[in-house]
C-alpha cells in the first residue's frame, strides 16, 4: 500500500467516524513520509449524518480531501501552510512518490496555474464574446499577428483545439471556446508528469451541461468491445440517468459528480475513493479566452502594447524624428555660415596683401 493509494482510498465521506480511524491506521499511518503530520485523524459531522474525514493539524481541522488535493497537486504554497515543518527535501521527495503512482494531478495543476496567471496578468483575456476577444487581440497585437500568420491550421491543447479561419479569426476563437467544458477523466502513465504521459477524455454522462456535438471528439471509449462501459465508476444505467433533472442555473456547473472538493451534499461532489491513484476526474468549466491562451501555450505572445498605445508611440516616434531632422538641418546651416565667415575673412586678407 503506497502513501497516495491510502490517501485515495480514504478520500470520501463516512457513515461512522470510527470507519476513518480504522482506515487511517491500516492505510495511512505507517505510509506517511517524514515532515507531514497526519498522526491525528478526526472527523467532522455533516447535516445528513455522514462524516468528513480529516486531521487535526496545528489546532485546525483539515479535511482529508484538502490534504489529497494539496499533496497530489504538488501545491507548494498549500504544503507550506499545512505542514510548515516540512523541509524542501521532504516536499521534493513527494515527487518520486507521485511519479511511482503515475499521478497526473501536478501536471494538471500546473496547467490551471498557467491559465489563472494569464488572466491575472492580462485581465482583458477573461472574455468569451466577440467584442471581448476583438479587444483582447487589439491589446496583444503580437498574439493576433501570430494567429493570423499561422494560416488555416488547427492548434491542439489539452482540453481545447482551435481551428483557425484567417478570414474570421475572432469567430474561430469564439467557436473554440464554445466547444470547451465537461467532465474530464485523466489517467497517468510512465510517471504522469507531462501531458505526453496522460490519457484524457470526456465522460459524457457526467457532462450534463454540454451538448454531445461539442464534446463528441473527446468522449471516452473505455472499452472498444463494450459500448456499455461508459464510466469508470457508474454502471450504464446509472450513467444514463445521472443527469436527470439537471439545471445549469441551479447547479452552477456543467458537470455532476466531478469535484472531490465540492460540498458532499451537492450533485457536483465526487466520491473518488474507488479509482486507482493514477486516475482522476475533474470538471472543466467552459473556457474564456485567457484559458484558451494558457492551454495552447500561447502566453509568451502576450504583453506587447495594444493599438492605442502603439499609435501613441508611433506619433511620438514621428515627433522625435522631426526634431532630429530639424537639428540636422540647423547643424548644416550653422556649418555653412561658419564656412562663409571663414571664406570672407580669408578673401579680405588676400585682397589686403595684394594691395
Swiss-Prot record:
UniProt signal peptide: none
Primary location: virion
GO CC entries: membrane; viral envelope; virion membrane
Residues linked to a glycan: 178
InterPro entries assigned: Baculo_ODV-E56
Additional facts recorded: Expressed late in infection (24 hours post-infection).
Family of the protein in this entry: Belongs to the baculoviridae E56 family.
Keyword Transmembrane helix in record: yes
Membrane topology: Multi-pass membrane protein
Reported function: Structural protein that is specific for occlusion-derived virus (ODV) envelopes but not of budded virus (BV).
Name of the protein in its database record: Occlusion-derived virus envelope protein E56
A Pfam family recorded for this sequence: Baculo_E56
Subcellular location(s) of the protein: Virion membrane
Taxonomic source organism: Cydia pomonella granulosis virus (isolate Mexico/1963)
Transmembrane segments: 150-170, 322-342
Protein's gene: odv-e56
Key words of the record: Glycoprotein, Late protein, Membrane, Transmembrane, Transmembrane helix, Viral envelope protein, Virion
Amino acid at each position: 500500500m503506497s502513501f497516495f493509494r491510502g490517501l485515495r482510498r480514504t478520500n470520501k465521506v463516512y457513515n461512522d467516524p470510527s470507519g476513518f480511524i480504522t482506515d487511517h491506521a491500516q492505510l495511512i499511518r505507517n505510509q506517511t513520509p517524514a515532515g507531514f503530520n497526519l498522526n491525528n485523524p478526526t472527523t467532522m459531522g455533516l447535516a445528513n449524518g455522514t462524516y468528513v474525514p480529516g486531521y487535526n493539524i496545528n489546532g485546525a481541522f483539515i479535511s482529508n480531501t484538502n490534504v489529497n488535493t494539496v499533496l497530489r497537486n504538488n501545491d507548494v504554497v498549500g504544503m507550506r501552510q499545512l505542514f510548515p515543518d516540512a523541509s524542501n527535501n521532504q516536499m521534493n521527495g513527494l515527487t518520486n512518490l507521485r511519479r511511482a503512482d503515475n499521478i497526473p494531478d501536478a501536471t494538471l495543476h500546473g496547467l490551471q496555474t498557467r491559465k489563472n496567471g494569464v488572466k491575472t496578468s492580462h485581465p482583458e483575456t477573461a472574455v468569451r464574446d466577440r467584442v471581448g476577444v476583438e479587444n483582447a487581440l487589439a491589446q496583444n497585437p503580437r498574439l493576433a499577428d501570430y494567429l493570423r500568420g499561422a494560416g488555416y491550421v488547427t492548434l491542439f491543447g489539452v482540453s481545447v483545439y482551435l481551428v483557425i479561419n484567417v478570414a474570421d479569426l475572432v469567430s474561430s476563437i469564439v467557436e473554440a471556446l464554445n466547444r470547451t467544458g465537461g467532465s474530464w477523466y485523466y489517467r497517468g502513465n510512465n510517471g504522469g508528469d507531462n501531458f505526453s504521459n496522460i490519457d484524457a477524455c470526456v465522460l459524457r454522462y457526467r457532462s450534463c451541461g454540454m451538448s454531445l456535438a461539442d464534446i463528441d471528439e473527446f468522449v471516452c471509449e473505455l472499452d472498444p468491445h463494450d459500448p456499455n462501459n461508459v464510466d469508470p465508476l457508474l454502471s450504464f444505467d446509472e450513467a444514463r440517468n445521472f443527469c436527470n433533472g439537471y439545471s445549469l442555473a441551479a447547479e452552477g456547473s456543467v458537470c455532476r459528480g466531478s469535484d472531490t472538493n465540492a460540498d458532499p451534499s451537492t450533485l457536483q461532489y465526487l466520491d473518488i475513493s474507488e479509482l486507482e491513484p493514477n486516475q482522476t476526474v475533474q470538471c472543466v468549466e467552459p473556457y474564456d479566452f485567457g484559458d484558451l491562451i494558457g492551454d495552447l501555450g500561447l502566453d509568451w505572445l502576450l504583453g506587447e502594447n495594444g493599438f492605442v498605445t502603439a499609435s501613441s508611440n508611433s506619433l511620438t516616434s514621428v515627433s522625435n524624428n522631426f526634431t532630429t531632422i530639424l537639428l540636422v538641418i540647423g547643424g548644416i546651416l550653422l556649418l555653412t555660415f561658419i564656412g562663409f565667415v571663414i571664406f570672407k575673412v580669408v578673401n579680405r586678407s588676400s585682397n589686403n596683401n595684394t594691395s
